[in-house]
């Protein structure tokens, strides 16, 4: 769910709180990583790729559920995710690291679109 007020003591908001804190503290790093994604994927493609990742993580990592939500084939979703993972963590990084870094890029992208501060 969405959290209006971010508080680490609220179990419903803990992850969102930590993501925002990390994004705020490491804004230069996240911005650099986001720009590198932008160099690899065109504007519209970057939008599609990040929407794919967001749907995948919102579906709890279920390829089937995310593919259904996006109205794409499961193989398409897996292909996009592999391309994103390789762009964010080329040759290294476990699933947690890939998810964390991609979620930071998704958050950064959404903040750019909304033109609002990270916190």
Question: What are the functions of these language-model segments?
Answer:
Residues 1-119:
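Cytosolic nucleotide-utilizing catalytic cores of signal-transduction proteins
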């Amino acid at each position: 769910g969405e959290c209006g007020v971010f508080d680490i003591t609220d179990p419903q908001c803990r992850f969102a709180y930590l993501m925002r804190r990390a994004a705020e503290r490491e804004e230069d790093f996240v911005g650099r990583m986001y720009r590198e994604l932008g160099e690899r994927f065109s504007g519209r493609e970057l939008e599609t790729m990040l929407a794919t990742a967001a749907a995948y993580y919102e579906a709890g990592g279920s390829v089937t559920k995310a593919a259904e939500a996006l109205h794409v084939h499961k193989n398409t979703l897996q292909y996009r995710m592999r391309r994103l993972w390789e762009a964010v963590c080329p040759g290294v990084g476990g699933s947690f690291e890939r998810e964390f870094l991609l979620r930071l890029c998704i958050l950064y992208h959404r903040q750019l679109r909304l033109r609002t501060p990270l916190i």
